[in-house]
């Protein structure tokens, strides 16, 4: 039951007093419904009206809702965009928006209508990366459904899986109990104040994606889709052993040490000087399913970075990250809370980066990467569960690495299972990836890179030099 509606239709306003206001607020402008990747992206501009309290969006199949009580309510609030993903394929959905005020008056203007057709036609997006091309931007080419996209544009955020990625508060049972405002994590999606450093962890939710990655000559071919196209497409980031998960979560911040466990909280210094085993164990204390970033989850993020910016040099595409070597004090988390889902500066090395809501995706401090090891003979060992220091139970795959590597990445293996594991390095950061790799056998991995490594850090930085396990 809509209690607010019941009260207001009986003449009781927001203050609990009888009101004689019968005039609804102005209509929204530019109401649009666009089908994208098995969902519908609804967008509009809210009216500049002091009487405006929110917008209610109704959905029907076959015809437009005749009133705000007709059909299914898919959204109610003050945002200007909503992704409707509770839909079926092969249907035409009719949407109608109704603005309302604090006294229950609804605007029923016919201008606030739109329709979207959802077809069972799987779209495959992708990029090709020519590793022989030293230019990190022109080395990347959009292919498939991605042809014609503008790198870095908001249009990309309407494509699956970008349109389903969201910041949330996650409880100890692994349940998202509140969605945060993508533009400002200090607020909930409904506009209330969010508690970012108390009971729940601040996490980013990532939906399942099917990925195919192979190398032909010097060209890495990456394709992804919202469903399994054929047996060559894998959803390894969403696998836990043999079980597929619909989503996975990563901490929005570098982990901090609180109450005897690792937390993803705003306003705290990152936990440092701990081994990967200590990090792993303290993360698990949060509840069932908690752990560290895994290799295949990070590969998922790397692929989306390339797709978003059409570049394999993250510092050139997004920002330097916190790489100011004159200040050795780790910055507290949350300084990018009000900076949306993406942020970076290409001139100021004291500014943090943020990608898909992940603060310090690189820079500030490196992040342990679980589920990957190199054997004494440099075979690659990977797993999607039961992570440990010895690679017990991990899958082994041969690599093109014969001994340790230390330098700037020029070529990677470029397969679905080996991802961007480097296979060739050079002495200069100029061209291609621009990130450093330090690969040694039997040691735990870190990714991203720390502030002390300056221009070496980035989305493809990889380090297994240090032996603390």
PLM features: residue spans?
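Beta-strand-rich modules
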Residues: 84-106
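Solvent-exposed loop/turn segments flanking beta-strands in beta-repeat/beta-sandwich domains
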Residues: 45-70
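Enriched but not universal
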Residues: 1-23
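Short aromatic-cysteine micro-motif
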Residues: 193, 197-200, 227-361, 365
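C-terminal, surface-exposed recognition/capping segments
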Residues: 123-125, 297-299, 320-338, 345-348, ...
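Pro/Thr/Ser/Gly-rich low-complexity, intrinsically disordered linker/stalk tracts
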Residues: 17-53, 89, 103-119
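Short S/T/G- and acidic-enriched coil/turn segments that sit immediately N-terminal to beta-strands
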Residues: 78-83
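N-terminal module-boundary/linker segments of secreted carbohydrate-active enzymes
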Residues: 119-231
């Amino acid at each position: 039951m809509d209690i607010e509606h019941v009260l207001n239709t009986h003449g009781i306003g927001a203050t609990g007093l009888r009101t004689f206001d019968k005039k609804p607020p102005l209509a929204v402008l530019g109401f649009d419904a666009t089908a994208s990747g098995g969902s519908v992206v609804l967008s509009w501009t809210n009216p500049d009206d002091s009487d405006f309290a929110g917008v209610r969006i109704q959905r029907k199949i076959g015809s437009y809702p005749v009133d705000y009580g007709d059909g299914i309510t898919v959204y109610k609030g003050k945002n200007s965009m909503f992704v409707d993903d509770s839909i079926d394929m092969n249907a035409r959905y009719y949407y109608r928006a109704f603005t309302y005020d604090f006294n229950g008056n609804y605007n029923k203007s016919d201008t606030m209508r739109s329709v979207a057709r959802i077809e069972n036609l799987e779209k495959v997006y992708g990029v090709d990366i020519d590793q022989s091309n030293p230019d990190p931007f022109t080395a990347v080419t959009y292919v498939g459904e991605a042809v014609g996209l503008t790198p870095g544009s908001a249009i990309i955020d309407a494509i699956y899986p970008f349109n389903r990625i969201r910041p949330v508060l996650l409880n100890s049972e692994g349940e998202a109990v509140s969605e945060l405002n993508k533009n400002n994590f200090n607020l909930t999606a409904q506009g209330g104040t969010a508690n970012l450093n108390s009971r729940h962890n601040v996490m980013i939710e990532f939906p399942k994606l099917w990925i195919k990655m192979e190398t032909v000559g010097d060209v890495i071919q990456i394709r992804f889709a919202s469903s399994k196209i054929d047996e060559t497409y894998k959803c390894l980031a969403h696998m836990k052993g043999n079980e597929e998960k619909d989503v996975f979560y990563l901490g929005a911040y570098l982990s901090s040490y609180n109450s005897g466990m690792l937390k993803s909280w705003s306003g705290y210094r990152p936990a440092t000087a701990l081994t990967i085993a200590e990090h792993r164990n303290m993360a698990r204390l949060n509840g069932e399913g908690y752990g560290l970033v895994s290799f295949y989850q990070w590969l998922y993020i790397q692929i989306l970075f390339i797709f978003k910016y059409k570049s394999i040099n993250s510092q050139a595409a997004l920002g330097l990250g916190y790489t100011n070597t004159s200040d050795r004090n780790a910055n507290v988390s949350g300084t990018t809370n009000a900076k949306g889902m993406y942020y970076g500066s290409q001139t100021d090395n004291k500014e943090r980066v943020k990608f898909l809501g992940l603060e310090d995706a690189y820079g500030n401090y490196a992040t342990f990467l679980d589920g990957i090891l190199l054997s004494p003979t440099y075979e690659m060992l990977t797993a999607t569960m039961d992570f440990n220091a010895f690679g017990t139970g991990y899958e082994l795959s041969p690599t093109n690495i014969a001994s340790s590597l230390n330098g700037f990445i020029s070529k990677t293996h470029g397969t679905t299972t080996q991802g961007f594991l480097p296979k060739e390095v050079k002495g200069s950061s100029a061209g291609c990836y621009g990130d450093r790799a330090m690969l040694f056998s039997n040691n735990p991995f870190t990714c991203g890179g720390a502030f002390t490594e300056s221009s070496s850090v980035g989305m493809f930085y990889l380090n297994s030099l240090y032996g603390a396990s």
